[in-house]
Amino acid sequence: MAHTMRVDVVSAEEEIFSGEAEFVALPGESGELGILPGHTPLITRIRPGAVRIKVTGQAEDEFVFVAGGILEVQPHVVTVLADTAIRGGDLDEAKAAEAKQLAEEALVNKESKIDYAQAQAELASAIAQLAAIQRLRQKR
């Protein structure tokens, strides 16, 4: 029997994934993190990007886009508390591309009454969504 861990991915709106997994990869604040069962306890912030979950007994990995959040790792439990989370199959490329364009325009428009940090965060999130869509396509 393979070693597994419980993985929960939740956002403020809903639980996106809950189940047993053999491996989780996600974008940590300092770079890509790979988590296996028995990992040392860890709490860290996560950047916008794709969470890849190797689900026990499934040939295909699960993908979830997160727009940042917190990761908590215990030896046999991984919890992702995401600001926003979207299942890989629910990502909308046209919507993400439009959000990217709007954020870029807001950053260029000096007369705009926008919060610069907010526009940068929206741009980073849109770029990460588009990258997650590309990764998902490559796996198919």
Swiss-Prot record:
Query: PANTHER family, per this entry?
Result: ATP SYNTHASE DELTA/EPSILON CHAIN, ATP SYNTHASE EPSILON CHAIN, CHLOROPLASTIC
- Protein name in the entry: ATP synthase epsilon chain
Q: Which family does it belong to?
A: Belongs to the ATPase epsilon chain family.
Q: Keywords in UniProt for this one? A: ATP synthesis, Cell inner membrane, Cell membrane, CF(1), Hydrogen ion transport, Ion transport, Membrane, Transport
Per UniProt, subunit arrangement is:
F-type ATPases have 2 components, CF(1) - the catalytic core - and CF(0) - the membrane proton channel. CF(1) has five subunits: alpha(3), beta(3), gamma(1), delta(1), epsilon(1). CF(0) has three main subunits: a, b and c.
- Pfam families linked to this entry: ATP-synt_DE, ATP-synt_DE_N
Question: What role does this protein play?
Answer: Produces ATP from ADP in the presence of a proton gradient across the membrane.
Known InterPro entries for this protein?
A: ATP_F1_dsu/esu_C_sf, ATP_synth_F1_dsu/esu, ATP_synth_F1_dsu/esu_N, ATP_synth_F1_esu_C, ATPsynth_dsu/esu_N
Q: Where is the protein situated, by its record's location annotation?
A: Cell inner membrane
Signal sequence residues:
none
One GO term of the cellular component aspect?
Answer: plasma membrane
CDD domains in the cross-refs: F1-ATPase_delta
Record organism: Janthinobacterium sp. (strain Marseille) (Minibacterium massiliensis)
